[in-house]
Amino acid sequence: MNKFKFYGCLGILAASFTFCACGNDDDNGKETGKNDVTWSTDGGIKACDHILFTAAGDANVNDNGRQIGNGDQEFVFTGKQTIKKGTYILKGWVYIADGAELTIEPGTIIKGDKQTKASLIAERGGKLIAQGTAQEPIVFTSEEAKGNRRPGDWGGVILCGKAVNNNTEMQIEGGPRTKHGGSDNSDNSGVLSYVRIEFAGYPFQTDQEINGLTLGSIGSGTKIDHVQVSYSNDDSYEWFGGTVDCKYLVAYRGWDDDFDTDNGFSGNVQFALSVRDSKIADTSQSNGFESDNNASGSTSSPFTSAVFSNVTFIGPKAVDASFQNNSDYINGGSVYPNNGSSLGRFQAAMHIRRNSHLNCFNSVAVGWPIGLILDNEKGDTQGAATAGTLKLNNIWFAGMDVLGTDFNKIYEDGLYDYETGTVDNTKNSFAHTFFELAANNNRHFDSADGWFDRTGYIPSADSPLIGAASFTEAILNGCTAVDYIGAFAAGDTWLDGWTNFDPQNADY
């Protein structure tokens, strides 16, 4: 995806200190137990220690309100408050400021306002505590009626922390003012657990969107597990630096990449599923993994060196036997938002480039045009693979058109010459050769027939994926050792209760 910065307060008027009484005695979990409301300004933006309102306008602050934010395009929350179980509308870019803490109860539904590109943004030192349960997940979704929801109906969820990245202090992408980065790798930005994020990723310009879930320099003190991002208008998940570990992630029918890692992200991610929609792909070419050290491919440290294990990538060919990788076929289908987002083609299960040292183990990818791209256009990703600082071990591919290529948007499995820009089809690509090295213990097949049950991603009882895992590499010490390749054991139930694979028709 294209990286960019978007500055400014969008015409927000600065407010002076004002004080008013709360409109209701029920403080909806506000920890001070007081009815006083404190207004201030933060960077020229109105700020308040209460976050709920009955309607747009500062005078409508009310802890029994159903609107999150005062209705301005940007609003800063400075207090500590719990949002009780219920249904709410999120308006504008709502920042959880340094020292503030927002807790959301299980079973809460938060609908993002389309007009204000609503987004919830935890800034450095702020905490978002969204701890749902399997029976009562917390849902961030579109305000549109069922049948009319589209990718990009609202902004998304952004967490920014104080952990290390390889560009010191960075502006988060997507529009908001927020910066991330620091030196505290154990920083705690809160909890996201049993959470769904649906129809997010509002496009400000072509290829300039907030992701479904954006994580900027998030530290290991943060808890992230059991999160499903569905129909994001950009990447489903993107990490910019940071050390946070994540488990039990679902990327469902996103627009661009499923799991995008940048700027020195070094956490562990285990048990993750991506399932594509054959009609949705981005103009930049959609991938399962996209991974950069940084935009220039420099040797800035820390390198992007995250460890992924037990990932299942279900590509467009696996979900649609009639799939064609062209613009006539990839038309957005029934969820095309007509909001300026440009469609493109599908590319690879794994696109690793720009000096990334990404690691992946015990994973399976099925039905992509390309299995693996090791791209040396900027930096020396192939050198990292040769040196063993980029590890791809015990990975199974099936049903790929080509096993590997060496350059973005090249669909030929031949050795790429970076000086002449030509492909030598008499030789295998570097990516192909690396994938097949005996020491890597990878395998590729023409078909995945018999591997999965009727879901298309959970292994059948006699699947060859069961019993095929290996956790002998020391780099996997931070992961849970299991005996299967991919995100699931046979009959696994970690998706049960909290996920929804038809959010278009959910009654909210």
Per-region residue spans from a language model:
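Primarily the HKD phosphodiesterase
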Residues: 110-111
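Glycine-rich loop(s) and the adjacent beta-strand/alpha-helix scaffold that form part
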Residues: 136-137
